[in-house]
Amino acid sequence: AAFDPAVEGVQVKDATYRIYRDTRFSKDKSPYKTWFGVYVCPRGKKSGFSGYYMHVEPDQNHYMLCTGAYCPTAGEIKSVREEIMTEGDAFVEAIEAATGFEVDWSSALKRMPQGWSADDEYSDYYRLRNYILVKMVDKEYFLRPDAIEHAAKDMQCTREFNHSLNRAIEYA
């Protein structure tokens, strides 16, 4: 919250996900999840807003920092696309300012969505279904004594990207 007043006041319970399930009467005592995730965004993880996500999964040696909107609704996607269409330069500048982060193209559409022009300068961004910037990190990143402060410092450069998404999501 130090670098983004929009997430000030978010409680821990509104940013974390449960790991364990009720195993009292089950033979299978394995946890519900084998990873730990924290999602800090305005009004909490269930708000639908874009935010900052930290993922730690030791079993798979999978560690990452993310910023953005994961699984937005159809209306929110349309609103973000309209934001890109009208404020494309600012959107691309926000992505470029996010040093060390890359756009996640893994769930992008193969073709241009219906009703959107492929001739537009920013048309590639219309194909995205999740508007996320990702930074893969290693285990040592989170073993540092100042890991949280370091993660916050890294995510600070993604603030403008988040703000542009949240402007569009709030409008949707």
Model-found features: residue ranges?
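A residue-level signal for beta-strand positions that form part of recognition/binding surfaces
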Residues: 16, 35, 130
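Long, solvent-exposed, polar/charged low-complexity segments
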Residues: 1, 104-172
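A structural signal for alpha-helix termini and helix-coil/disorder junctions
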Residues: 2-5, 86, 90, 97, ...
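Aromatic- and glycine-enriched beta-alpha-beta binding-site module
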Residues: 22-85
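N-terminal low-complexity, intrinsically disordered segments
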Residues: 10, 23-31, 139-142, 149
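Gly/Pro-rich turn-and-neighbor structural signature
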Residues: 1-28
